[in-house]
């Protein structure tokens, strides 16, 4: 890794209000850059609006932490150090859930990742988008690496995280765009978002991606679903409710962003609203 080049890019981004899109539009930064996987991931996340990192670093995330240090020195990113991975994952979930700002959780290799994974259940079960970045065993087939799962089987952490939500093992640095595309679609899913796990093998973190095209990386745009409700649907619903004495509205987790609409519908129909575990707080108790 050429620290001078990393510092140069970080400075340019900082001078452009930490807006990578602006840097590319004004050609302050070239579209194609030679960067390590670690820096490429930081740039890719920055383009998606991720600037806050909740971290407990270790030998599994040393290279990533070193690049992050440089970007923080120029004010592009902000890192918050924690002492407990479960607490860290919960804090990241709260930031994304309450303030609509997606952060990244960073751990080392082994037990730290498992702890953060346990904490990510809150994000997974409540449909909250958060990035999780864990150090991972090398791609050289050396077997489990230090405190990793002691079993001679390939890609164990990738399998576990894929079961928890969705994940990508960056075995090949050039696959960064594909991993980030999947992460974008998961963390910003308008109906069922969730945590996305990036597994960074120790040996691929410093590997250089030649000519990474920053333009093709996903941006920070929201994913919008087209409205499938027609006037016919509304008329049919109106006819249905006219012939029913009592209406009860059952509200699930997908209603969290539509509390005003749910309230108005409830008032117009004089109908009580039954909440589910994923929609608690959508409406006040009274």
What are these language model-derived features?
Residues 2-286:
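N-terminal alpha/beta PP-like core and its mobile active-site loop of ThDP/TPP-dependent enzymes
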